[in-house]
Amino acid sequence: VSDSATNAEIQHKTFHLKLLRDFIHQAQQQPPFIDDQCPQEDLEFLQALEALPAAQSQEDFAHRGQQLMCRVVAAYPQLMPLLHRDLLWFFGGDCLHYMPDEEIARFQELDERRHQALAEGREFSYERERANLLGLH
């Protein structure tokens, strides 16, 4: 594995962990989590969400991420505008049920470009390619 491939993979994971931390930070400031009488179930969900970035090297990281993202969709719809769509794609699995086909196709294209660059040993900036593909310049 080339240095550029390793760097691209690290950059890809780091980008998504940043989005995850950003979402967690924003969620912490929203009801029901800021309520004085926040139900225990909601506090436990928030604690599980807060613990997720630290679990990135664990085998069940993707599965835990899927479960938590799906729980956001089902139990905390008010948080959906804060949830980066990239995280649904990143964790995959059942999360994909909440993405329209066109959105999935864009993320597939982005992954294909990343894998092609890695296969060819080319440098690849996930953030730059994502911005170009999603029209975020």
Q: Residue ranges of each PLM-predicted region?
A:
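Amphipathic protein-protein interaction modules
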Residues: 60-118
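Alpha-helical oligomerization segments
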Residues: 109, 113-137
